[in-house]
Amino acid sequence: MAPLPTRPSARSRRLKFALAAVVLAIVGSSVTLLAVDVYLHRKFERSAGFNIWGYRGPAVGRKTADEYRVVMLGGSAAYGYGTNWDEAIPAVLERNLTGRAVGPFHRFTVVNLGYNNEGAYSFTFTLNDYLSLRYDLAVLYEGYNDLMGDPKAPNLSVFRHDSPVFRLTGYLPIFPIVFKEKAAAILTGTTASQYLSPSKTVFQRPIATKAAAEVLLVAARAGESLERQLGRITAEPARHIDDPDSAGCRYPWQQYCRSMIVAVDFALQHGAQVLVVTQPYGAGPTFKSRHSDQQSEMAKMLERRFSGNPRLRYVNFGDVVDLFDPQLSFDRMHLTTAGNQRVAAAFAQPVLEMAAQRASERQ
């Protein structure tokens, strides 16, 4: 007869119960938060948010044989800050190309991979993250977010990689952002208040209102706490820009140019074409002068490094939009719906020409 199993001690039972409770709490919280997050994605992905895979607009399906797929990378200008997803440049460009055909391509898809504050450093990460989209053309559309040109503090923002969940699964949670902004709006009447310094004075709301906001903040912090726990598993190396001087650009644009080189090289090595585009020149003499200088250095670098490569093209939209025109720009940087339409119209011909070049490769 086999010996009877030893009955666990009271202390052992308590420890196992505590462990089970912790596991169930984490799993239960995760399932609940996931359900909430999916709902919020559906609610906000067509306005100011992004879909479950971390890019703006509806998720695209499997690429078809007759499809020419474009991805547009950049900061808030590409993302379409201040407008709905279908008013941003990528969505307008896609509509403008509807019905056009170039060789074997009878369908054009433009995917918005931009995000607020992203600079050139983020491009290689984003191109790698979305290789599964099998894009034909990568549009690199950003200079504003690298205009500080500070070698000691370059723009190393890679928004999606701030999420351990995205790094591990490709799913990008949205509820911490939504809940924090809703709480800020409840307390101060504007989502921008969450970004103010602690010393900034804001009007106080009644106790009940503050309690409602606190519930939202607690929920957001719970999600962030779960992400931090997951972050221990998916930790990444510290972000930095390797060998910026090798770009050959004048100070202070070496890091910007180096990031552009790395991104272009990555796209070309993975079989994609690249369209590098200068944004409308900044408003005001200082902004415009600095932006023009940055883009001039970058354009000369592309010519030195990639001259003669038919899969790379540079175009300059510096004068396409006057950022002083309130009909085209609401803050002298970000574009209105009309401004986005004008830039999207300028994009159409270069994209069609790149598609024609791609078609010639297939012959």
Where are these regions (language model features)?
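Sec-exported extracytoplasmic/periplasmic mature domains
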Residues: E94, T98-V102, N128-S132, G143, ...
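Solvent-exposed, polar/charged alpha-helical surfaces in well-ordered, non-transmembrane soluble domains
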Residues: A91, R95, Y121, F125-N128, ...
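Residue-level recognition of beta-strand->loop/alpha-helix junctions
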Residues: N112-G114, T278-Q279, N316-G318
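Catalytic His-Asp segment of secreted/periplasmic serine-dependent ester chemistry enzymes
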Residues: R239-A247, G282-Q363
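N-terminal secretory targeting modules
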Residues: M1-V71, G82-N84, V102, Y121, ...
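Serine-esterase "nucleophile elbow" of acetyl-processing enzymes
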Residues: W53-Y115, T124-R134, A138-V139, N340-Q341
